[in-house]
Amino acid sequence: ACIMAQTMQDFHLLIVNDCSTDGSVECVKRFFRQNPRQYELVSLPENRGLCAGRRLVEEHATTKYLLFVDADDCPLPTLVEKLYHKISSDSDLLAVGCYQSFMDSKGKDLTGGIFLGETSKEGFYEKAKKEKLIFMQPTAIYDRAIALSVGGHQIEGFPLGKPRYQDLCEDLDLWTRMSDLYIQGKAIVVVPEVLCRYRKHEKALSANSLGMLLRMRHIKMNLKRRRKGLDEWSFIDFRAQLYTEEMRRLEKEACAADALRRAYYHLRAGHIIAGVKDLFLSIKSNPHYFVDKVKHNLLRMK
């Protein structure tokens, strides 16, 4: 419904069925029988995860730009129009994102959101030159061919099985790879406006925080290696060279992140004792993490 409500409809709609078993394919077909529109449905023979699906689209599509919308994304009506007009207005732009707000499983607004990214090319150049990771919410429009030229979504060099590390911070990896092209005057910016809402599920209290921290370290290391003209390391090689002390520090930071997430949902549900307990656990595990979240998220509450 969010796609059908877009003010700009001149785009090719490609739907990827990652071997779903919940009747999603029939739901899609039934929806478009009732709401006629161009669409292409690609069904994968096996479930390979988020990043593999994105890589398939990058290689399968023929359009200049791509914009992914996942199951828990709720684009506002002007998302496609505003992002497309922005990126197509300046040949220097590689990708354009926006701000994102949070909602619960019933569509009720939650505090916080994703308000990241540079709003000007000059700001982006400064960040890219300093070898900073490029954080931007994943519901963004980007140049498909240029993304592939820097490696696209990476699916090789990861251990088999779960967790699928390639599915963690996959957008961060792509934006950071594309940022290497700042030396050619290319840039990644955001439209400083909430154009998408993201559904956060109350029961999803756990997340692979340790895995995400490892991936961020991996992405940062490869950024520095690329800028020095060195070969990148696979995630398998990166993980193997970590020292025990370093892993313990990352585990404490992951514990802080998980505890703070649980505390938020417990307090919101009125479970005061459980919420306070997890809040103190988060602060004890890594006080710097708690302060950083307050600085970059809670202070943005309207």
Sequence positions of predicted segments:
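A conserved acidic beta->alpha catalytic loop
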Residues: 17-26, 46, 70
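Glycine-rich, basic loop-to-helix element that forms the pyrophosphate-binding segment
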Residues: 44-61
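Short, acidic, metal-binding catalytic loop of nucleotide-sugar glycosyltransferases
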Residues: 1-10
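Conserved donor NDP-sugar-binding/catalytic core segment of glycosyltransferases
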Residues: 78-111
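Conserved nucleotide-sugar donor-binding catalytic segment
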Residues: 120-217
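Short aromatic/hydrophobic "clamp" motif used to bind/position activated sugar donors
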Residues: 66
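C-terminal subregions of glycosyltransferases and related glycan-biosynthesis enzymes
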Residues: 180-188, 193-302
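Acidic helix N-cap motif at the loop->helix transition within catalytic regions
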Residues: 22-30, 74, 78
